């Protein structure tokens, strides 16, 4: 019996799927929030949560494992310097997936996936159109 071996196929070849998930992981770590389809967001959660858990323990072995999965030196540094300490007291559940309705072109279910406890970037935008 199969019983949950592997990832969702997402209608892609194995190499395309792994490259897409790696790129989405790096994008999520860089921007801390991205918009994607709901099945991709659910699959991304299964990929990125163990990587964030690696970032909680700062060791050479964990850095090598993270680089092996991310292939982006800048994101490995951010993972261990910023994200690891941020989630030191949290045992899993580092992400939030919010449903956003459906895409206009193909009616695909869309989702907003973001890291929890991210710093607020509330910048007031001045309206100069009235002058």
Swiss-Prot record:
Gene3D superfamilies: Ribosomal protein L17. Keywords: Ribonucleoprotein, Ribosomal protein. GO terms for molecular function: structural constituent of ribosome. PROSITE patterns: RIBOSOMAL_L17. GO terms for biological process: translation. Disulfide bonds: none annotated. One of its GO terms (cellular component) is cytosolic large ribosomal subunit. Belongs to the bacterial ribosomal protein bL17 family. PANTHER family: LARGE RIBOSOMAL SUBUNIT PROTEIN BL17M, RIBOSOMAL PROTEIN L17. NCBIfam families: L17. Part of the 50S ribosomal subunit. Contacts protein L32. This is Large ribosomal subunit protein bL17. The lineage of its organism: Bacteria, Pseudomonadati, Pseudomonadota, Betaproteobacteria, Burkholderiales.
